[in-house]
Amino acid sequence: MKHLLISIVGMLSIYTSNAQQVIDVHCHNIFPEFTEFLERHGAAMKETFPLPQWDIDTHLEFMENAGIGKAILSMSAPQPYYGNTDECTRIVRFYNEASARLKSDYPGKVLFCASLPLPDVEAAIKEAVYALDT
């Protein structure tokens, strides 16, 4: 009985340690197309706060080395509204669809927070519905 109890406790501790994982909840995926968009608007902040180059392979390697099991990606600042709602909506849709492809390509490793084309509330509602339905 004593050995059974020790075995059960040992198995539970292994299960518990395997069930836990580190989740990076503050992670920005910066697609080259987003950086180009910001550059067109003079908003890339190259001299003061340049956005890093980002790619999924390098990020997955970083996650592995850091012991991160899952990343929740989100769009970086600055937000992409520069007076043109249609343009903002297009880049946000691009970001959401590209992020959804990453989620699909790397199941269990990558999730993302959909972005919304603010400050246009109507466009934001449409994008939220689209993001939730796809």
Annotate each language-model stretch with its function.
Residues 10, 18-134:
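Helix-coil boundary/capping segments in enzymes
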